[in-house]
């Protein structure tokens, strides 16, 4: 599986969980929390801090783990904000082409 296919698959799962909630799903617990969009945003902040600390402290074994957590929670937050992943990818592509 390619890197982009893995991210696309993860995105598809997040979208599907929002459309078809699954009891006990972590994604659904974030998307349906009483705090609304604040819950996934709190997780983005938490995971960003953990990622920064892992990098700053040179904890190479934790950097990839924290980056994965951050990426996952960013995807959930994007979905909660009704922003499709394709818009983010288009923006990245546009920045790449402008070089």
From Swiss-Prot:
Protein's cellular compartments: Cytoplasm
Record-linked SUPFAM superfamilies: all-alpha NTP pyrophosphatases
EC number annotated for this UniProt entry: 3.6.1.31
Catalytic activity entry: 1-(5-phospho-beta-D-ribosyl)-ATP + H2O = 1-(5-phospho-beta-D-ribosyl)-5'-AMP + diphosphate + H(+)
Hydrolase among keywords: yes
CC annotations in GO: cytoplasm
Enzyme class, UniProt record, top EC level: hydrolase
Superkingdom of this protein's organism: Archaea
UniProt entry keywords in alphabetical sequence: Amino-acid biosynthesis, ATP-binding, Cytoplasm, Histidine biosynthesis, Hydrolase, Nucleotide-binding
Matches recorded under InterPro entries: HisE, PRib-ATP_PPHydrolase-like
BP-aspect Gene Ontology terms: L-histidine biosynthetic process
Pfam families referenced in this protein's UniProt entry, alphabetically: PRA-PH
Predominant location: cytoplasm
GO MF term list: ATP binding; phosphoribosyl-ATP diphosphatase activity
Keyword Amino-acid biosynthesis attached: yes
Pathway annotation: Amino-acid biosynthesis; L-histidine biosynthesis; L-histidine from 5-phospho-alpha-D-ribose 1-diphosphate: step 2/9
Entry's family note: Belongs to the PRA-PH family.
Protein name per UniProt: Phosphoribosyl-ATP pyrophosphatase
């Amino acid at each position: 599986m390619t890197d982009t296919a893995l991210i696309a698959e993860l995105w598809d799962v997040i979208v599907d969980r929002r459309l078809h909630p699954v009891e006990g799903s972590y994604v659904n617990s974030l998307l349906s929390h009483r705090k609304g969009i604040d819950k996934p945003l709190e997780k983005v902040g938490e995971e960003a801090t953990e990622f920064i600390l892992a990098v700053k402290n040179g904890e190479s074994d934790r950097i990839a783990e924290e980056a994965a957590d951050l990426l996952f929670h960013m995807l959930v937050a994007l979905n909660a904000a009704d922003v499709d992943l394709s818009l983010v990818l288009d923006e990245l592509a546009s920045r790449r082409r402008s070089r």
